[in-house]
Amino acid sequence: MRSSGGIGYVCKFAGVVAIVLLMAACGRHGEPKEYGIGTTGSIAAPGSPQEFAVNVGDLVHFEEDSSTLSGEARSILGHQASWLNQYAQYRVTIEGHADERGTREYNLALGAKRAMAVKSFLASQGVNAARIKTISYGKERPIAVCDEPSCWTQNRRAQTVLNNPAVARY
């Protein structure tokens, strides 16, 4: 009679170990090349959505009950416009958001005003308005969920979302 296990088990185990070691030996060698225009040390290829989000910035924030762009927001949007003018293959969606206070209808309208303020600024900086669509989520998609001013501040925002690269037809 043959015993089950024994040598067969050892051979299977050795085979699995050999495969794992071979896969580890095939891993990346050397340091990855850093790309990007910021000083964050992030790894992002030029013209990639990662570069846009990390090095350029995809969020601007607003004061309570306001769709007026602050100086900081204008600075971030200026960088966005430069990047979008350089990489014209992207279309964008500007998502307008609000904090949890107020009615759903009020916050949807406020989110729409915030998204339009961003679109208008980007267009004034040379980004073709046909590449920019807007949507308001009002208070429906918060970043931070709590009943405190620190959360409300984070949720009063507009986010620029890159869509798949488009064929220039605008």
Which residues are covered by each model-predicted region?
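Extracytoplasmic/secreted proteins, especially bacterial periplasmic and envelope-associated proteins
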Residues: E72-H79, E105, K113, A117, ...
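A contiguous binding-surface segment within folded domains or other stable secondary-structure elements
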Residues: H97, R104-Y106
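Periplasmic peptidoglycan-binding/tethering modules of Gram-negative envelope proteins
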Residues: G27-R91, N163-Y170
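Short beta-alpha junctions and helix-cap segments that line functional grooves
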Residues: A144-E148
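C-terminal motif of bacterial Sec signal peptides marking the signal peptidase cleavage site
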Residues: L21-A25
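A generic structural micro-feature
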Residues: S150-Q154
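A non-catalytic structural micro-motif
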Residues: Q89-H97, A112-I143, R156-Y170
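Bacterial N-terminal signal peptides that target proteins for export
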Residues: R2-G15
